[in-house]
């Protein structure tokens, strides 16, 4: 329970940092017209967007990793205190679920920061953060709001399938699902299932994040800056 709450807090902090940084920094470039000075130099718009995005991610990842390291050390100390007979095997004390939770938190941050970057091209900070908040809530709950049932009308099934394709399912990246997958009965099939779960979550998040960043570059290339 403590581990799950700590990872959720780290995730929310990282999401807030990434979204606020992208919404404030990029929007401020347009408000102060400093983007014109940057683009007058031999810097393409692609590199401008990628530089902003990667810089924000570097700072956010450093924050999340440092907090995750503190949490993991605290869990190792707690596990060491619960073991008897002076167990010295470090691998038995490392909380791999915590590490996986931190990594999947970063995947959520990657996606939502990219969404915020796109919105920052046209919206101010308050509108940007508001949309990101509703986007995050919807992506964590739409598997309940839009359940896929075979008995539904075909048109409704198509609509819900489109929603599953357009919106990332953050619920598959949170600690509830991670605990369900890891805590299942140990077997060769379960080990393979965990590996598939990690690969699927990572690949899907990477593809979605790449598509959103490409959209940001596409829109920024066509944006008139006066």
What are these regions (language model features)?
Residues 46-49, 220:
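Alpha-helix N-cap/helix-start motif at helix boundaries, enriched for small hydrophobics
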Residues 1, 88, 122, 127-218:
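Terminal transmembrane helical anchor/hairpin motif
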Residues 34, 45, 125-126, 225:
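Membrane-helix interface/capping residues of multi-pass secondary transporters
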Residues 37, 48, 128-132:
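Alpha-helical transmembrane segments and their helix-entry boundary regions
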Residues 19-39, 43-45:
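Transmembrane helix boundary and interhelical loop/hinge segments in multi-pass membrane proteins
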Residues 1-25, 49-125, 148-165, 194-196:
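Secretory targeting signals
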Residues 217-226:
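Membrane-interface capping segments at transmembrane-helix boundaries
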């Amino acid at each position: 329970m403590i581990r799950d709450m700590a990872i959720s807090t780290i995730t929310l902090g990282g999401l807030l940092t990434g979204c606020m940084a992208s919404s404030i920094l990029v929007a401020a470039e347009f408000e102060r017209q400093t983007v014109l000075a940057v683009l007058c130099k031999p810097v393409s718009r692609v590199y401008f967007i990628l530089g902003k995005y990667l810089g924000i991610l570097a700072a956010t990842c450093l924050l999340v990793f440092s907090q995750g390291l503190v949490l993991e050390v605290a869990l190792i100390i707690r596990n060491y205190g619960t073991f008897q007979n002076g167990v010295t095997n470090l691998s038995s004390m490392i909380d791999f679920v915590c590490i996986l939770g931190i990594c999947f938190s970063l995947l959520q941050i990657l996606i939502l920061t990219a969404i915020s970057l796109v919105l920052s091209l046209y919206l101010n900070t308050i509108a940007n953060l508001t949309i990101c908040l509703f986007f995050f809530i919807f992506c964590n709950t739409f598997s309940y709001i839009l359940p896929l049932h075979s008995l539904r009308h075909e048109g409704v099934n198509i609509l819900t399938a489109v929603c599953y394709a357009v919106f990332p399912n953050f619920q598959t990246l949170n600690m509830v699902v991670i605990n369900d997958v890891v805590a299942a009965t140990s077997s060769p099939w379960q080990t393979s299932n965990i590996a598939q779960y990690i690969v699927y979550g990572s690949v899907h998040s990477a593809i979605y994040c790449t598509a959103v960043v490409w959209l940001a570059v596409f829109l920024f290339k066509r944006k008139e800056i006066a």
